[in-house]
Amino acid sequence: MFLVLNDRFHLAGEWVVGGFEAKGLAYFFVLMALGSLVQKQLKWVWPYLGFACAFHVLVGGWATIALLLALMGQAVFRSSDANEQREQVSLGTVLKQHAGFVLAGLLLAAVGALPPLLADIAANPATKLMASQIYVQARISHHLVFSAFSASRVAGFVVLLMIFGMVGSRLKRLDKSRQTDWRLLIAFAIGSLCISFCGLMLSGVSEQASVLADHSVGLLRFYWFRMADFAVPCAASLGLVAIMQLLWRRGMLGRAASTFSAVAIALAMAWIGIDRHSDPRPRADQAVLPSYEDNQERTAGTYRNWLRVCDWIKNNTPTDAKFITPDQQQTFKWYAHRSEVVNWKDVPQDAQAMVDWSQRVGWLIQPQRRAELGLMTYPDWRLRELAVTYGATHLLVPQRQVDLITDACDFKQVYPVDPATKATYVVFEFPVADVE
């Protein structure tokens, strides 16, 4: 249920399960920390969060901040009930009683925090600002800037917030011995929403003509909406399960309501599963490879031919070959096991490398988006210059662009071997002397 809510009702595109990345491991440790939190094994919360920071400093860092906000919120909004006051967790008490575990968490967190802090230490302020603008406003705005979020994503997240609010109010009916546990989890989600609210404010400031705009852009790099995409579905889904358990204990009517809810959730999950598997291509290829809604066979054929050309490249080119590749793909390195000059999906993190990446995008990706001929709009001498500049040995382009050019390309076509054979993709080899 959590994965469905995260996949369908996220605001900023944050996923928890969907690929093998450092943040997936970080979320595992965040979940372990939350498990320790609700089981009142507070000493283990901090090492788990430290491990999360070590794998992904933003995931672990925002989770830590959300938890600290939750604990501080408990101190501010203390219950008037004496029994509940004894159950509530004091931040000061936690830090005093578990100082060693907190220190261990900080040391682990430093493993993930120091590398990004040191990466840009030599970059000048102008380069850092330019890199922030590229990252926030040009490349990742759909994850970082509220105004770039689609209306459907905002509407979906509002629905999720309504579910979350309903769950929070219903959980008050749980017995007192467990209410504090759920209150901490709900408070953690609210803490993540407070972080997102700060991101909303920064998004607004970044779009104003003021001296604070540049500073806001720099701060928006840190994914202020990320943790809410995780924490709110997590709290809502676990709360829904708790509510169904509560209903089950309330006689026949409650059991009927609980059963109906479980069946409805199962049917929704089944429908989503069927919808996701209606296209057999991996999601990375679904997202970028050419698709034709009115011609599924052409879509499947394009995917098969993409696999074929990548397999040919893997088996027939030197391991140190470097390719200029099509914009409409993000899996070349995965299938072909070769490097490429630039890819829209592969964004470096240090400031100078990001500026260099943006220049490559300008020369090699933007032309593919502006013109039907893509890179074939360049004359051969210009393609040769770009190959020399970036050390490219091969050019991979769609067949349709080759078919549209009026003057034959002077570069040697190596795939398909017979130029008369038509394939979805064509590989040209740059002259060795030019590249060297």
Residue spans for each PLM region:
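Membrane-interface transmembrane helices that cradle and orient dolichyl/undecaprenyl
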Residues: 25-44, 77-86
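Short periplasmic/luminal acceptor-recognition loop of GT-C membrane glycosyltransferases, typified by
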Residues: 298-370, 384-402
